[in-house]
From Swiss-Prot:
One of its GO terms (molecular function) is oxidoreductase activity. This is Protein FixC. It comes from the Bacteria. The keyword Secreted does not apply. InterPro entries: FAD/NAD-bd_sf (IPR036188), FixC-like (IPR039651). Could be required for the formation of a functional nitrogenase Fe protein. Probably accepts electrons from FixA/FixB and reduces a quinone. The gene is fixC. The keyword Flavoprotein applies. Keywords: FAD, Flavoprotein, Nitrogen fixation, Oxidoreductase, Plasmid. GO terms for biological process: nitrogen fixation. Transmembrane segments: none annotated. It comes from Rhizobium leguminosarum.
Amino acid sequence: GSEIKEYAAHLIPEGGFKAIPQLFGNGWVVVGDAAQLNNAVHREGSNLAMTSGLMAGEAIFQIKSRGGLMTKRNLSLYKGMLGKSFVMKDLMKHKDLPSLLHTDSHNFFMTYPTLISQAAQNFVRVDGAPKINTEKATAASFINARSRWGLISDAVRSAVSWR
């Protein structure tokens, strides 16, 4: 058998596309979550880390194969490969979403989940009351919590960020 000698853990950054640091320099590349390559929208990270590591390795292999040095200019090949991959395309698609969620986190992580949960309960509740009353009460709870303008604003900002 084996015995565990050490445990390790770390926080996973979720800054998104706009938080990606410099990915390469003279003699170095950054991959995975160290490069902020996490897609918080789709809860992806491991696949992005593996793909970025693979691409960094391929870039380094190509540079070494032609006798090149690990200069910033040569290692820019890694950034180009990453830019053509699904990794950057997906992160770019949702580039504005992290800032929206961080700016208005209480509504997106507390208010809306609570309202949606209550609406779902109201929708399936069998209590003998006319559903029109339940639907009006549910709509009123959303308006009371966020106002009509707040709901419209959140919907538009979400749609723009989600594009």
